[in-house]
Amino acid sequence: IVKPRRHVVHVWELNDAEAAELGPLLQQVTRVLAALVEPEQVYVTLWSHMHAVPGHIHFVVQPVTAARMEEYDGLHGLRLQLAMFERRDAMPADEVNAIAARVRAHLAAG
């Protein structure tokens, strides 16, 4: 997940500095994930609702492999994400934390 440090409900509320940082950061994170996971695609999806009320914006950055799409009968994009949500299919927290640590290390190394 990539999100602004400051509480923001809408993208248009980002100040110029935050907006200028966001695009390159998403590019860097997806580039590192592509190198680490070798996915078919890295989805970047903006979410902000919590119980039908806009909350803090955050971008879900999700590497998706061909094998994962095959598990879901070839679904991709939003349909794949919805099917995964319906099944409550998520990586275990320890795996997410391990990948996040590797991404942070790559970003810190430049």
Identify the role of each PLM range:
Residues I1-G110:
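HIT superfamily nucleotide-processing domains
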